Amino acid sequence: MREPKLGAVVGKKGVGKSYTTLKLMGQYVGGSQQAKPRRVLILDVNDEYENIKAISLTDVAKFSMHPKVEVRRIRPYQPDGTRMTLRDFSDALFTILEHFKGGLLLIEDINKYVSDSLPNDLIGAICTNRHRDLDIIMHFQSIGRITPKIWQNLNWLRFHKNSDSVDRHKKKFEDK
């Protein structure tokens, strides 16, 4: 049985985090001889994945069970067309973590809507995704923004060009 993975991608804006992750998502949805195809869901807080079909937050459970394997995204808008607030993004992430399973979740720009002191229940939900057969990738602008609990649970880290000095954080890498 496969073990779900928790990954982090770190780098400043415009260095290819989303581009590289999109290529990975294509492989994920396509599958291989070793791995069956799996669906992908993006929490698109910046509305930047315009080439990917959107779904409503209320349809996440249906998407999770649908036989068609594809990439979909949650746009940063309420059903009435107003932009989601920072609290709405946090609530949306809870909803996704509760209902989406058997795929890959990309949490884009997580520091935009979650403060330096992430709620413990949200971090716990992200870190205990194994029971949902859910792989998670989180995009961060800075390596220093990854919380200790997330560091402890990471399976992998992809590092892009960054303005942070890694020397400040090198002790975090000792077991990675």
List where the protein language model places each region.
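Conserved P-loop NTPase mechanochemical-coupling segment
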Residues: 62-84
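Hydrophobic/aromatic beta-strand patches that form the interior of the parallel beta-sheet core
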Residues: 7, 41-43, 55, 72, ...
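Intrinsically disordered, low-complexity coil segments
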Residues: 29-36, 77-87
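Pre-Walker A (Motif I) flank of P-loop NTPase domains
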Residues: 2-8, 38
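Walker A/P-loop NTP-binding active-site region of P-loop NTPases
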Residues: 15-61
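Structural alpha-beta junctions
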Residues: 32-36, 54-68, 95-101, 132
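Conserved P-loop NTPase motor cores
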Residues: 7-26, 83-175
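Terminal domain-start segments
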Residues: 39, 73-76, 87-92
